[in-house]
UniProtKB/Swiss-Prot annotation:
Protein name from the UniProt record: Aspartate 1-decarboxylase
Gene encoding the protein: panD
Residues that, per the record, bind substrate: T57, G73, A74, A75
Enzyme Commission code: 4.1.1.11
PANTHER family xref list: ASPARTATE 1-DECARBOXYLASE
Organism: Methylibium petroleiphilum (strain ATCC BAA-1232 / LMG 22953 / PM1)
NCBIfam families referenced in this protein's UniProt entry, alphabetically: panD
C-alpha cells in the first residue's frame, strides 16, 4: 500500500505578484525551489493563511534571490499580494519509505528570505 506523504513545504511564503491573464502556474524564487527540493512543473498544493483557500497548480521558477511568489492564471483569484501561503508537495510512499521519510520544511521570513530549513 502507498500513502501520500508530505515531501516538502515552503512555510509562510508571501505573495508578491498575481497575474490573472498569465496562462497558469505559481512562480517561485529558484533559490527557494532549490532549498525545498521542488522542481519546475511539479504539482503543488497551496494553503492561503489569510483566507483559508486551498488550491493546486504547478511550479515555474522565478529568478533566484528575487523573493518572488507569483500566482498566475486562475490561481491569481485565490490570493492577494501580501497574503501568506503554505506551499506543499506530496509523494506516494510505501510503508518502508514512510518509516524513514523526513519531509523538508523551509521557513520563510520577510521578503521570502529563508530563515531556516528543517527535516522532521
Amino acid at each position: 500500500m502507498n500513502r501520500l506523504m508530505l515531501r516538502a513545504k515552503l512555510h509562510r511564503a508571501t505573495v508578491t505578484e498575481a497575474d490573472l491573464h498569465y496562462e497558469g502556474s505559481c512562480g517561485i524564487d529558484a533559490a527557494l525551489l532549490e532549498a525545498a527540493d521542488m522542481r519546475e512543473f511539479e504539482q503543488i498544493e497551496l494553503y492561503n493563511v489569510n483566507n483559508g483557500e486551498r488550491f493546486s497548480t504547478y511550479v515555474i521558477p522565478a529568478p533566484p534571490g528575487s523573493g518572488v511568489i507569483s500566482l498566475n492564471g486562475a490561481a491569481a483569484r485565490k490570493a492577494h499580494v501580501g497574503d501568506l501561503l503554505i506551499i506543499c508537495t506530496y509523494a506516494p510512499m510505501n510503508d518502508a519509505e514512510v518509516a524513514t521519510h523526513k519531509p523538508k520544511v523551509v521557513l520563510l521570513g520577510p521578503g521570502n528570505r529563508i530563515e531556516s530549513v528543517r527535516k522532521f
